[in-house]
């Protein structure tokens, strides 16, 4: 059975980069080469074919990559990639979704030099491992604060209410990519955007109500999120990385630990005293999350 996963830390790729995407292919848990070429087909969220059955390059056993090229990384976007090849004498395909983002919350170099430099070893902690964990942390911070801390793509499918105003699902909307109403593409110049609160104004018409043909009749593609690293999110991300990657002999649900130096108390993730919910075991990270989550309550 073929199992396909992200490889080389390419789940997130930067805008204006070569756009390298990679996949690792395992048969029964073992990295396995394809018999012959592996091809790549890349489709944008609107169905546009960006890459059609091009040959991927082999990096190492069972790992293949393809460079999208700068033409396809000029803006944030999500792409669906189909990897196709022959394994176990059978033609097989696997689909992964990759994201072009406008920034990273921290770099591999920062990760290796942070704090006590616990991640300095490139053999113990590869760039791939750091990049994969960074992508997970980026998603966690978005889930926990309802704000994106890097520029990201989103495609919203909404119902119009016959109003010139439309509330988008996110704050900090940087720019519009496309707007479609009842299946008709409308020039983005016809709209005004309140970036801070995520409200879109139609200057020359109304966002019509849905129909049976178009039940979600308003489709808006946009970039949202902070354009640069702000409010110390890089430090928060690095502290989370420091807690998540290095192996510890202390079980994660340990509440206290006693040795010759005395007893140390630990914060446990989950419900704490006085109704406090701890997202992590770090007081600093938890305080930062509480501050930045509270800032959007009531919005």
Question: Over which residues does each language-model region extend?
Answer:
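Divalent metal-cofactor coordination and adjacent catalytic microenvironments
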Residues: 2-20, 26-51, 61-299
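Short beta-strand segments within Ig-like beta-sandwich modules, predominantly Fibronectin type-III
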Residues: 55-58
